[in-house]
Amino acid sequence: MESQVAVAGDGETEAEAGKGPMIDSASQGSLVSAPKGAVRWKLLRQVLKQKQLDDGLRHVSVRRFESFNLFSVTEAKNRGTEKEAGAWVQYTSIFYPEYSISLRRNSGSLSVEDVLTSFDNTGNVCIWPSEEVLAYYCLKHSHLFRDLAVCELGGGMTCLAGLMVAISADVKEVLLTDGNEKAIRNVNSIIASNKKTGVFKTQKISSCVLRWDNKTDVSQLEGHFDIVMCADCLFLDQYRASLVDAIKRLLQPSGKALVFAPRRGNTFNQFCNLAEKAGLSLQRHENYDERISNFHSKLKKEGSDVYEENLHYPLLLILTKTG
């Protein structure tokens, strides 16, 4: 994800560099005697506090387009006494309205510590369009998951797609994962809340922190899943190869991965190249659903300044572990 924050170099404050917000004299005075590392830290705090990160993300190009209109979102009932952070909402499929689930979305801002010290926070901000499309695809093709063990990787604060599998399919097991601990704490609360209402078709639904670059996390589940799926997880250069390796190791022989992601420059192709080198067979699909394709075409014809195919239209990649 792009960052709109520019941090001044070692030898200059942001005011001197002519960038970013000015720091008032009181703040400057408190910084003069501080070690250089502390100065940079306080400067970064000043910058990030000017605008909450989740609010700022709504204005960058990757977030201007928010939805393919596949789910309705309403305020969840009986949440008036909820004291926890985050707003509970009801997500209901527009085309399969019998499937609905209560979600706790992140409504608070991310702290500076979250940004600098936590594993990938992109999923803590919102439900991205690719996740929405994957969730819809899982509902439409719920028969594919019958009696299978399913894992969602990088599901963020809600793991919406994995939840849709758990409420619609006669699935053997569903594991919801993300590399961020804050995200998984939220997913745990979503699972616990919805178990009380009896919406899950499977009793074996759980969540855990799973970092693709952590060999221990992956090895504990090696060869366990029939289907692994993820949405819009390909654009971070430092994790792309690790994601390919994790998918291959988590899958059983002949297992499949469902990957939805926009092109985002060359990142989709780079992931495909890595997957081929790892020995996975590939099937790429651009027109995988008539509703999605029609909505995509409509947006392109309208010439909307909030929708950009390269950033927002998810392609479907099906990977198969051979041997």
Swiss-Prot record:
GO molecular function, one term: heat shock protein binding
Gene3D superfamilies per UniProt: Vaccinia Virus protein VP39
Biological process, per Gene Ontology: methylation; mitochondrion organization
Cellular component terms per the entry's GO annotation: cytoplasm; nucleolus; nucleoplasm; protein-containing complex
Entry keyword set: Cytoplasm, Methyltransferase, Nucleus, S-adenosyl-L-methionine, Transferase
Start and end residues of each stretch annotated as Disordered: 1-29
Catalytic activity: [calmodulin]-L-lysine + S-adenosyl-L-methionine = [calmodulin]-N(6)-methyl-L-lysine + S-adenosyl-L-homocysteine + H(+)
Subcellular location field: Cytoplasm; Nucleus
Pfam family, one: Methyltransf_16
Primary localization: cytoplasm
EC number: 2.1.1.60
Family in the record: Belongs to the class I-like SAM-binding methyltransferase superfamily. CLNMT methyltransferase family.
Known function: Catalyzes the trimethylation of 'Lys-116' in calmodulin.
Subunit structure: Monomer. Interacts with HSP90, probably as a client.
Protein name: Calmodulin-lysine N-methyltransferase
Organism field: Rattus norvegicus
Lineage summary: Eukaryota, Metazoa, Chordata, Craniata, Vertebrata
Gene: Camkmt
